[in-house]
Amino acid sequence: MNRDDKAALVSQLNDSFGRAKLSVVADYCGLKVSELQQIRIELKGCDSEIRVAKNTLLKRAADGTGTAVLADDFTGTTAVITSYSDPVGPAKVLTQFAGGHEKFVIRSAALEGEKIGVDRLEALAKLPSREVLLGQLLSTWNNVPTGLVRVLSGVPRTFVYGLQALKDQKEQEGK
């Protein structure tokens, strides 16, 4: 790889790191190519990607981005996973993959520029996705007006039932 290729790669990585909401550093030593392809496909489905490059190039690319807090973890065989939208999906994919593959070890992560540990990444993976949370919020908002309408319609309904009972009572007295 010549100097121009390295500069182009650093530029691409810098752009990726700058747009990333979630960045994860993992050790992939000993994984088969087919296993890397598997996680690459799974990550692509949730607007994320996994990149492998030399650690010095990763450090240069991380400068000035939210991923810079992870620069100390760029040692050994390093893969960097970047997510550009909802961080929950990639966190789920990575924790499930790491659970099934001993040789894939998550070192650390950065969520919007703040370094988080593996335990917080696993907690993030347990959250429902953004779409599910929005659905739950919408359901809650929908239930409030519905309940209010039921309460408000209960008063006239009770009044009408009372009038009907009074009418029935008068009719029975008249017989």
UniProtKB/Swiss-Prot annotation:
Keyword annotations of the record: Ribonucleoprotein, Ribosomal protein, RNA-binding, rRNA-binding
Cross-referenced SUPFAM superfamilies: Ribosomal protein L10-like (SSF160369)
Gene Ontology BP, a term: translation
Taxonomy, superkingdom: Bacteria
GO MF terms held by the record: large ribosomal subunit rRNA binding
Entry keyword annotation includes GTP-binding: no
GO cellular component: ribonucleoprotein complex; ribosome
Family classification: Belongs to the universal ribosomal protein uL10 family.
Subunit structure: Part of the ribosomal stalk of the 50S ribosomal subunit. The N-terminus interacts with L11 and the large rRNA to form the base of the stalk. The C-terminus forms an elongated spine to which L12 dimers bind in a sequential fashion forming a multimeric L10(L12)X complex.
Record function comment: Forms part of the ribosomal stalk, playing a central role in the interaction of the ribosome with GTP-bound translation factors.
Name this protein carries in UniProt: Large ribosomal subunit protein uL10
Gene source species: Desulfotalea psychrophila (strain LSv54 / DSM 12343)
